[in-house]
Amino acid sequence: MNSPQYTDSNYSEDEGLEDYKIDGYHPVHVGEILLDRYVIMQKLGYGHFSTAWLALDNNNGNYVAIKVQKSDERYIQGAYDEIEILQALAKKNFDKEWINSLREYYKDDKEKLNELETVEHTQVVQLLNCFIHNGQNGKHFCMVFEVMGVTLLEIIKRYNYKGIPLPLVRIITKQILIGLDFLHRICHIIHTDLKP
Protein backbone atom coordinates (compact mmCIF):
# COMPACT_ATOMS: atom_id res chain seq x y z
CA MET A 1 0.00 0.00 0.00
CA ASN A 2 1.37 3.41 -0.94
CA SER A 3 1.68 6.11 1.70
CA PRO A 4 -0.64 9.10 1.29
CA GLN A 5 1.45 12.04 0.15
CA TYR A 6 1.47 15.05 2.44
CA THR A 7 4.18 17.62 1.88
CA ASP A 8 5.60 20.22 4.22
CA SER A 9 3.59 22.80 2.27
CA ASN A 10 0.45 21.32 3.82
CA TYR A 11 1.12 23.40 6.90
CA SER A 12 3.14 26.57 6.79
CA GLU A 13 3.35 27.32 10.49
CA ASP A 14 4.33 25.26 13.48
CA GLU A 15 3.10 25.32 17.03
CA GLY A 16 6.36 26.65 18.47
CA LEU A 17 8.33 25.07 21.29
CA GLU A 18 6.88 26.88 24.32
CA ASP A 19 4.03 24.37 24.78
CA TYR A 20 6.33 21.33 24.70
CA LYS A 21 6.42 21.06 28.48
CA ILE A 22 4.65 19.30 31.35
CA ASP A 23 0.88 19.48 30.66
CA GLY A 24 1.64 20.48 27.06
CA TYR A 25 2.29 18.75 23.74
CA HIS A 26 4.00 15.36 23.51
CA PRO A 27 7.18 15.63 21.38
CA VAL A 28 6.11 13.06 18.78
CA HIS A 29 8.82 12.16 16.28
CA VAL A 30 8.86 10.35 12.95
CA GLY A 31 9.51 6.65 13.53
CA GLU A 32 8.03 6.69 17.04
CA ILE A 33 5.67 3.79 17.74
CA LEU A 34 2.55 4.48 19.78
CA LEU A 35 0.61 1.70 21.51
CA ASP A 36 3.09 -0.87 20.07
CA ARG A 37 1.11 -0.50 16.87
CA TYR A 38 1.14 2.92 15.17
CA VAL A 39 4.36 4.01 13.44
CA ILE A 40 4.53 7.79 13.07
CA MET A 41 5.24 8.72 9.43
CA GLN A 42 4.87 12.50 9.33
CA LYS A 43 3.20 15.50 10.90
CA LEU A 44 -0.16 16.56 9.50
CA GLY A 45 -0.73 19.67 11.57
CA TYR A 46 -1.57 21.07 14.97
CA GLY A 47 -4.18 22.95 16.93
CA HIS A 48 -4.39 24.65 20.29
CA PHE A 49 -5.17 21.33 22.02
CA SER A 50 -3.22 18.76 20.01
CA THR A 51 -0.90 17.78 17.18
CA ALA A 52 -1.96 15.48 14.33
CA TRP A 53 0.19 12.79 12.75
CA LEU A 54 0.06 10.39 9.82
CA ALA A 55 0.85 6.88 11.05
CA LEU A 56 1.00 3.35 9.71
CA ASP A 57 -1.11 0.82 11.62
CA ASN A 58 1.10 -2.27 11.90
CA ASN A 59 -1.93 -4.43 12.72
CA ASN A 60 -3.51 -4.04 9.27
CA GLY A 61 -1.14 -1.99 7.07
CA ASN A 62 -3.54 0.95 6.81
CA TYR A 63 -2.64 4.58 7.24
CA VAL A 64 -4.37 6.50 10.02
CA ALA A 65 -4.37 9.99 11.46
CA ILE A 66 -3.55 10.27 15.16
CA LYS A 67 -4.49 13.30 17.21
CA VAL A 68 -2.19 13.57 20.26
CA GLN A 69 -3.80 15.79 22.89
CA LYS A 70 -1.90 18.06 25.26
CA SER A 71 -1.54 16.37 28.65
CA ASP A 72 -3.14 19.08 30.81
CA GLU A 73 -6.14 17.66 32.70
CA ARG A 74 -8.42 20.31 31.13
CA TYR A 75 -7.88 18.79 27.70
CA ILE A 76 -8.52 15.22 28.84
CA GLN A 77 -12.18 15.96 29.63
CA GLY A 78 -12.59 17.59 26.22
CA ALA A 79 -11.16 14.46 24.61
CA TYR A 80 -13.62 12.23 26.50
CA ASP A 81 -16.48 14.46 25.33
CA GLU A 82 -15.27 14.25 21.72
CA ILE A 83 -14.99 10.46 21.93
CA GLU A 84 -18.50 10.16 23.33
CA ILE A 85 -19.87 12.14 20.38
CA LEU A 86 -17.81 10.21 17.81
CA GLN A 87 -18.95 6.86 19.22
CA ALA A 88 -22.57 8.01 19.07
CA LEU A 89 -22.07 9.00 15.43
CA ALA A 90 -20.53 5.62 14.57
CA LYS A 91 -23.66 3.84 15.80
CA LYS A 92 -25.73 5.73 13.21
CA ASN A 93 -23.60 5.01 10.11
CA PHE A 94 -25.94 2.35 8.76
CA ASP A 95 -29.20 3.82 10.05
CA LYS A 96 -31.95 2.76 7.61
CA GLU A 97 -33.30 6.30 7.25
CA TRP A 98 -29.77 7.54 6.52
CA ILE A 99 -29.09 4.87 3.88
CA ASN A 100 -32.36 5.85 2.17
CA SER A 101 -31.31 9.50 2.24
CA LEU A 102 -27.97 8.60 0.69
CA ARG A 103 -29.71 6.69 -2.09
CA GLU A 104 -31.58 9.88 -2.90
CA TYR A 105 -28.46 12.07 -2.67
CA TYR A 106 -26.49 9.77 -4.96
CA LYS A 107 -29.27 8.62 -7.30
CA ASP A 108 -27.24 9.83 -10.30
CA ASP A 109 -23.97 8.24 -9.14
CA LYS A 110 -24.11 4.46 -9.72
CA GLU A 111 -20.66 3.87 -8.22
CA LYS A 112 -21.65 5.50 -4.91
CA LEU A 113 -24.98 3.66 -4.89
CA ASN A 114 -23.18 0.30 -5.14
CA GLU A 115 -20.99 1.16 -2.13
CA LEU A 116 -23.75 2.34 0.22
CA GLU A 117 -24.33 -0.96 1.99
CA THR A 118 -20.66 -1.62 2.73
CA VAL A 119 -18.99 1.76 3.21
CA GLU A 120 -19.71 4.54 5.67
CA HIS A 121 -20.85 7.59 3.70
CA THR A 122 -21.60 10.03 6.46
CA GLN A 123 -19.05 12.65 5.34
CA VAL A 124 -18.09 12.75 9.04
CA VAL A 125 -14.69 11.49 10.20
CA GLN A 126 -14.69 8.04 11.80
CA LEU A 127 -12.94 7.31 15.11
CA LEU A 128 -11.02 4.02 14.84
CA ASN A 129 -9.34 3.79 18.25
CA CYS A 130 -8.32 5.81 21.30
CA PHE A 131 -5.73 5.34 24.01
CA ILE A 132 -3.59 7.11 26.61
CA HIS A 133 0.11 7.59 25.84
CA ASN A 134 2.46 8.13 28.79
CA GLY A 135 5.04 10.61 27.57
CA GLN A 136 7.73 12.81 29.08
CA ASN A 137 5.24 15.70 29.43
CA GLY A 138 2.44 13.67 31.01
CA LYS A 139 -0.44 11.45 29.93
CA HIS A 140 -1.65 12.29 26.45
CA PHE A 141 -5.05 11.19 25.18
CA CYS A 142 -4.69 9.95 21.59
CA MET A 143 -7.47 9.50 19.05
CA VAL A 144 -7.00 7.45 15.89
CA PHE A 145 -9.01 8.43 12.82
CA GLU A 146 -9.32 7.39 9.22
CA VAL A 147 -7.07 9.51 7.00
CA MET A 148 -8.98 12.29 5.30
CA GLY A 149 -7.98 14.59 2.46
CA VAL A 150 -6.60 18.08 2.73
CA THR A 151 -8.48 20.82 4.56
CA LEU A 152 -10.61 23.42 2.83
CA LEU A 153 -8.02 26.00 3.84
CA GLU A 154 -5.34 24.03 1.96
CA ILE A 155 -7.53 24.01 -1.15
CA ILE A 156 -8.02 27.77 -0.84
CA LYS A 157 -4.23 28.18 -0.54
CA ARG A 158 -3.63 25.97 -3.59
CA TYR A 159 -5.68 28.44 -5.62
CA ASN A 160 -3.68 31.35 -4.15
CA TYR A 161 -6.70 32.74 -2.29
CA LYS A 162 -8.25 33.68 -5.66
CA GLY A 163 -11.30 31.46 -5.40
CA ILE A 164 -11.98 27.78 -5.95
CA PRO A 165 -13.33 26.58 -9.33
CA LEU A 166 -17.12 26.25 -9.24
CA PRO A 167 -17.22 22.48 -10.00
CA LEU A 168 -14.99 21.88 -6.97
CA VAL A 169 -17.11 24.23 -4.84
CA ARG A 170 -20.18 22.15 -5.77
CA ILE A 171 -18.50 18.89 -4.74
CA ILE A 172 -17.22 20.30 -1.44
CA THR A 173 -20.54 21.96 -0.63
CA LYS A 174 -22.47 18.75 -1.29
CA GLN A 175 -20.14 16.80 1.00
CA ILE A 176 -20.46 19.39 3.78
CA LEU A 177 -24.25 19.49 3.52
CA ILE A 178 -24.53 15.70 3.53
CA GLY A 179 -22.33 15.56 6.65
CA LEU A 180 -24.41 18.25 8.37
CA ASP A 181 -27.63 16.48 7.44
CA PHE A 182 -26.28 13.29 9.01
CA LEU A 183 -25.29 15.16 12.19
CA HIS A 184 -28.49 17.17 12.53
CA ARG A 185 -31.28 14.94 11.28
CA ILE A 186 -29.97 11.46 12.10
CA CYS A 187 -27.74 12.08 15.15
CA HIS A 188 -29.46 15.19 16.57
CA ILE A 189 -26.12 16.95 16.96
CA ILE A 190 -25.46 20.56 16.02
CA HIS A 191 -21.95 21.28 14.74
CA THR A 192 -20.84 24.63 16.15
CA ASP A 193 -17.28 24.87 14.80
CA LEU A 194 -17.29 24.69 11.00
CA LYS A 195 -14.21 26.28 9.47
CA PRO A 196 -11.78 25.79 6.57
Regions from the PLM with identified roles:
Residues 1-33:
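Juxta-kinase regulatory segment immediately upstream of eukaryotic protein kinase catalytic domains
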Residues 139-142, 147-196:
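Conserved alphaE helix
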Residues 80-87:
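AlphaC helix of the eukaryotic protein kinase fold
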Residues 40-48, 52:
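Protein kinase glycine-rich loop
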